[in-house]
Design a protein with these regions (language model features):
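Short acidic/glycine-rich loop or secondary-structure boundary segments that cap or lie
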Residues: 183-186, 228-229, 241-244, 268-272
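A generic structural signal for short beta-strands and their flanking turns/coil linkers
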Residues: 215-217, 229-231, 254-259, 293-295
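ATP/NTP phosphate-donor binding region
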Residues: 2-94, 104, 339, 346-347
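ATP/nucleoside-binding phosphotransfer catalytic cores, i.e., glycine-rich phosphate-binding loops
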Residues: 247, 252, 262-347
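Glycine-rich phosphate/pyrophosphate-binding beta-alpha loops
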Residues: 179, 183, 234-247, 315
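Glycine-rich beta-strand-to-loop/alpha-helix junction loops that act as flexible
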Residues: 41, 97-99, 124-126, 237
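Catalytic core of DAGKc-family lipid kinases
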Residues: 42, 55, 62-64, 73, ...
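Short glycine/serine/threonine-rich phosphate/pyrophosphate-binding segments
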Residues: 79, 101-106, 131-132
Length: 347
């Protein structure tokens, strides 16, 4: 049997040990694993300084039976192509090291695989926001995260799928959070050179500019027999939103639902007044703020004002857009303290 064929056979064994309802599955250290480590050297502020940490992490992973080959991205979209190649090669595991954008690219490569081989995903934090790392309680230091992963288990989780109604070819999977309104505008308008220099502060700077010039147009949010005209919607798969903020705090990565949050106001000053409530996690119950859960949501413009959307902090398209849950769309390697999480089965 060729080595590549053996990898495919072993991967099938790994998948069969992971349950289909999202319950705890196969320990990663049960067999020797052939992994691909996808590193974005431009993510965060690490650059070349991150390479020795990755070498240390690879040694740690090897002690747990995970042999990780390191591949670096060279530009936008590269991580998606590399992840797709990993599925074709029959890899046992893909490890992403980069920011939320890198992670989103890898997710789109794995979830979009055409050969039916579902390769589990793992994460080593390397970006500015690291939303998923926070959600999984992973240390932000790369070797520390590697130590957690070798004792983790593979879980089936749902993904969000965002489809622009007028440009369905631009559909994208997302793992953490999507949104439409001012956050989409900020993501579209942020200075990428500034982001490379100062990280997440670039979004704060762009947000301050948008408060002064954005029109906050209303659009319609339709989900679970609820229809609300809003200036912002957050479509959460995770509790963490970005930076220090948690918005959709009842969201559960292991549940087949979004938590939605909408704001009605069209006033930039009112948005600023929400900041203390956001900082202290007191948005629930605030006038004009709505939370509820759904497995699909449609956002439609009400006039000619463009409303932009983002997924996992990356620009998507203008409304109208449909966001929907796709159960068991991804296999995720989670640390032990998340692996025993109790999951409510969703039909």
């Amino acid at each position: 049997m060729e080595l590549r064929d053996k990898h495919r056979a072993d991967a099938k064994v790994l998948e069969s040990n992971s349950t289909e309802d999202g319950q705890p599955g196969s320990p990663m250290n049960s067999n020797q694993q052939n992994a691909l480590l996808i590193h974005n050297p431009n993510a965060g502020n690490g650059g070349k300084a991150r390479r020795p940490l990755l070498d240390e992490a690879r040694k740690i992973l090897a002690t747990g039976g995970i042999e990780a080959e390191l591949v670096e991205t060279r530009g936008p979209g590269d991580a998606t192509e590399i992840a797709q190649r990993a599925t074709n090669e029959g890899r046992h595991l893909v490890i992403a090291c980069g920011g939320d954008g890198t992670l989103n690219e890898v997710v789109n490569g794995l979830a979009g695989a055409q050969n039916g081989h579902r390769v589990p995903l793992a994460l080593l934090p390397g970006g500015t926001a690291n939303i998923l790392a926070k959600e999984l309680n992973l240390p932000w230091d790369i070797p520390g995260a590697a130590k957690k992963l070798i004792h983790g288990e593979v879980r089936d989780i749902a993904l969000g799928l965002a489809t622009p109604v007028n440009e369905p070819e631009k559909k994208r999977w997302f793992l953490s959070v999507a949104g439409a309104g001012p956050d989409g505008m900020i993501v579209y308008a942020v200075d990428l050179d500034l982001k490379a220099r100062v990280g997440i502060l670039a979004y704060w700077w762009q947000g301050a500019r948008e408060v002064l010039r954005y029109k906050f147009p209303h659009f319609r949010v339709i989900a679970d027999n609820v229809s609300i005209d809003s200036s912002l919607v957050v479509v959460g798969r995770t509790k963490n939103y970005g930076g220090p903020f948690k918005i959709t705090t009842d969201a559960d990565l292991f549940e087949d639902k979004f938590e939605l949050m909408t704001l009605e106001t069209q006033s930039g000053l009112r948005y600023l007044s929400y900041l203390p409530s956001l900082w202290f996690n007191k948005l629930r119950g605030t006038d004009g703020v709505h939370f509820w859960k759904a497995d699909s949501v449609v956002c439609e413009p009400l006039d000619s004002n463009p409303v932009y959307a983002q997924v996992d902090g990356e620009p998507l398209a203008r409304l109208p857009i449909e966001f929907k849950i796709v159960p068991r769309a991804l296999k995720l390697l989670v640390p032990q303290d998340n692996a025993t999480h109790k999951v409510r089965a969703v039909a």
